[in-house]
Structures are given as C-alpha cells and as structure tokens.
Amino acid sequence: MADMKKIATRVSYGNTLVELARQGADNLVVFDADLAAATKTEIFRKEFPDRHFDCGIAEQNMVGVAAGMSTLGYVPFVSSFAMFVAGRGFEQIRNSIGYPHLNVKIAATHAGLSVGEDGASHQCCEDLALMRSIPGMVILSPADDVEARAAVIAAYDYNGPVYLRFSRLATPVFHDPATYQFQIGKGEKLTDGYDIAVIATGLMVPEALRAAVLAKRQGIAIRVINMPTIKPIDEDIILTAAHEWRRIITVEEHSII
C-alpha cells in the first residue's frame, strides 16, 4: 500500500461537491463555520461562491439555518470538524434535523485521534455514538477517495439526514473507481482469510489491510471487512463473520464505551 496514491477524504468531499454542482445539482448548498480551508469546502466556494455560506464560529446557528433552507427544497451540506458539528451542534441536529427528518447532510471532518497536532480538544471519539442515537440518521464512514466520492453522491441522492465522517490525514486509494459500487447499508470483503475477521471503518481500513499483510508473513490469514455504513449497519456480513470465525476484531477511531 506504500506505493498507492494518498488523498484525504475531506479533499474528496470538497471535490465531489463541485462535481455534483457542475452536473446539475442546482439545489445543493454548502455551509461552513469558519473552517472552509480545513474542511475543503473552499474548493466549492471558489467555483460557486453564491451557494456557499460561512456562518462563522457558530455551529448551532449553522445547523439551524441549514435546516430552514432544507424546508425550501435545498439540499444543504453542513461542514465542520467532527468535534464542533457533532459536539457543539448536537442539540440542533437532534431537534432541528433529526426530529422532523429533514434532508440535511452533515459532513464531519477531522474525526478521531488522527487529528494529531490539533490536540485532544479536537479529537472527537464520541460523534458516531451521538449520531447513532438519533432515529433515522444515516451514518457513512468512507475509507478512501473513491469510497468518499461515492458516499457523498449517495448522501445527496438519499432523502433524509446523513452524517458523513471524513479524515484529516491522506489515506491510500485502494478501491478501483471503474468497478467499485457503493450502497448504503452494505459492507465489503476486502481480503480472504480464515483465522481472524477484522471489521474496520474509515481511516482504520487501510491500517487493517496493512496488518493483514504483516500477519500473512507470520502464517495468519485475516479477512478484512470494510464497513463504510455505520447506520444502518450490514448485519448480514457481521453474522456471516460470526458464524465462520471464532475471533472478530473491530477497528475504529472511536470510543467503544
């Protein structure tokens, strides 16, 4: 995987917003909270400045404005760091988007521990638990550029609230864009193996693939399963793994409490 091209999924997010708008998604609007350079919505702003709204450091207000615009037929993508949009904006997401089941997409970048030098205050390891608790909320956690692009398109096409989780760091692009097909609610087997099953999501998927390579050198065959949808989760692929292997390891940048 060392030779693979690396792209941060937050960059994939910004690029795909532009592609959607170019292809006729005239109802797509993008919101940010003074972090457009980091969330990469600046890519969209440069080409469609009249459809990009910077709400300043006011995540709760941003969520409320986006909810209101969705009632007028727009499809808002709300963007900020996971800690800020899911943490600071939780009440508004719950009451203004989740409760009325509005068609708003929440794009959370810089999720998990891999935020690194941004520090502990920015390392969000609670967002998936918060978003899973909201009835009707779809949660997507893509692993590479190809999957992230497909997830953004799927989120736009889906009529309802979606939480998209993106990484700060660049990750290897291991999917083939010519053959990969994304479907909400479906996991994906990446490697064969009959000793251990590893179920990973997001940034941890390429780490699981690297671990599988190292384990193979020691005679251990790992089946790596990519779980790009956290909710609704692919129960079938999990139950199959439980029936076929005695050991299942889950890998995620998130608290398991």
Positions of predicted regions on the chain:
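Thiamine diphosphate
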Residues: 1-165, 167-257
